[in-house]
Amino acid sequence: MDVCMLEKALSDKTKAVMAAHTLGNPFDLQAVKDFCTKHNLWLIEDNCDALGSKYVIDGEEKFTGTIGDIGTSSFYPPHHMTMGEGGAVYTNDPLLNKIARSMRDWGRDCVCPSGMDNLCGHRFDKQYGELPLGYDHKYVYSHFGFNLKATEMQAAVGCAQLEKFPSFVERRRHNFDRLHKALEAVSDKLILPVPAQNSTPSWFGFLITCKEGTSKNTVVQY
């Protein structure tokens, strides 16, 4: 990611920067975070490739996905951990938390957890748009949304995966080091990946870039 392009892309319509930690190798979070702070923008980290990666920002090492205003993860089978399908959105911001939960639950305006009603104490005493006064707030859908809740079985699989997750990350780093060492002999033909500055990647893939004179098809068919 060329962070120098951020200023060129900025306009009056810009509200957020969303960027991915491609293949587990973090982008320049310090530069992007500083840019977002300077221009009062949300920072959304697509952390689907990088669960378990770490980055040193402002002198403190943090997990990627926790530095921006929003982080995302994917639990599709090839990723660092799986629940069969689905993913997660995480944030420390109360407003973004409310918005994400609403979008997850069909755009529901009420934020009461499942099985708990009237936590706000105003379930039946307000008016919403042209709906009649006292309309049940639990069934007011004020925004667009989806039905994106995980099943209990998926959650159980996810909990089991979390227990094994540190070993998954360790194995991915081991495999990366093994591949890198094996391919150093042909580094005159290939550009091998290296960790971004100030980062400890949790690798999702191994990027190989062919140097001039080396055919991609030759590498693929080898």
Model features per residue range: what roles?
Residues D2-C4, K8, A16-A20, L29-A31, ...:
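PLP-dependent aminotransferase class I/II
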